[in-house]
């Protein structure tokens, strides 16, 4: 039987400015952030959380992403796509049962449509917004990454479906955390022999956001962003969870990376 494990992986980095990540900070200084994604192995079928950057940006960033490359430049090797990394760990892409999308921004959609038997779980509000985003958010959504024929989608409905238990056994729970994006969700991972891990994803890019010292450089709603962090802080304390922020280069360095894992 397959052990329940959490693998932390990275699909390259994004080069940007500090103020793109921490609002009104950095005085224009350069900043480079990791682009994490996650694999949960499970006897009921594996789950990929997000998937990082689409592999296409390894060879043609501007052709795939367009003008947003002027703000966020992807650094990705050809072997750093999520499918190749999961194969390198010895897992068959056909055994991935779920692709869970925290949201649909361009640095989180690398797994969509890459796993032939996967159901893609996303908030309905995020999916709908991604097709018709507001002008200030449009560059963050690459339609060809998620508007693909033949995909199996499962839509969650905000607070109505909050704390959705993906496997039905407590291993993976979604937490509705709008703000950074209208339909953002974070994840709680419970493992047999480790403390729970709270994957904030982009509800908190960095520990500065988590500790309420800065707002993220991009958000759809300031009020929702702040309240989602407060919600997660309460949840993390309740479950004594280890917090994994979305793009913090310093904090990310402290976690085990694949092929090491949490179990």
From Swiss-Prot:
Binds 2 Zn(2+) ions per subunit. It catalyses: an N-acyl-L-homoserine lactone + H2O = an N-acyl-L-homoserine + H(+). Zn(2+) 1 binds at residues 103, 105, 180, 202. Zn(2+) 2 binds at residues 107-108, 202, 247. NCBIfam families: AHLLactAttM. Belongs to the metallo-beta-lactamase superfamily. This is N-acyl homoserine lactonase AttM. It comes from Rhizobium radiobacter (Agrobacterium tumefaciens).
């Amino acid at each position: 039987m397959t052990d329940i494990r959490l693998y932390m992986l990275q699909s390259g980095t994004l080069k940007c400015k500090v103020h793109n990540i921490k609002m009104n900070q950095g005085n224009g200084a350069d900043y480079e952030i990791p682009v994490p994604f996650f694999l949960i192995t499970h006897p009921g079928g594996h789950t990929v959380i997000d998937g990082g950057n689409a592999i296409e940006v390894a060879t043609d960033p501007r052709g795939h992403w367009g003008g947003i490359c002027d703000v966020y430049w992807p650094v990705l090797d050809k072997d750093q796509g999520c499918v190749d990394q999961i194969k390198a760990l010895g897992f068959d892409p056909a055994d991935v049962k779920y692709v869970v999308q925290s949201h649909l921004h361009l640095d989180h959609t690398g797994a969509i449509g890459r796993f032939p038997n996967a159901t893609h779980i996303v908030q309905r509000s995020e999916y709908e917004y991604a097709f018709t985003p507001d002008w200030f958010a449009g560059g963050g959504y690459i339609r060809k990454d998620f508007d693909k024929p033949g995909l199996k989608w499962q839509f969650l409905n905000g607070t109505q479906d909050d704390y959705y238990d993906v496997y039905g056994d407590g291993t993976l729970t979604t937490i509705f955390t709008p703000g950074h994006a209208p339909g953002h969700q974070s994840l709680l991972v419970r493992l047999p022999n480790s403390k729970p891990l709270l994957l904030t994803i982009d509800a908190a890019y960095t520990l500065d956001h988590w500790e309420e010292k800065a707002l993220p450089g991009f958000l759809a709603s300031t009020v929702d962003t702040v309240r989602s962090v407060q919600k997660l802080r309460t949840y993390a304390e309740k479950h004594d969870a280890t917090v994994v922020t979305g793009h913090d280069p310093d904090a990310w360095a402290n976690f085990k990376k694949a092929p090491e894992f949490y179990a």
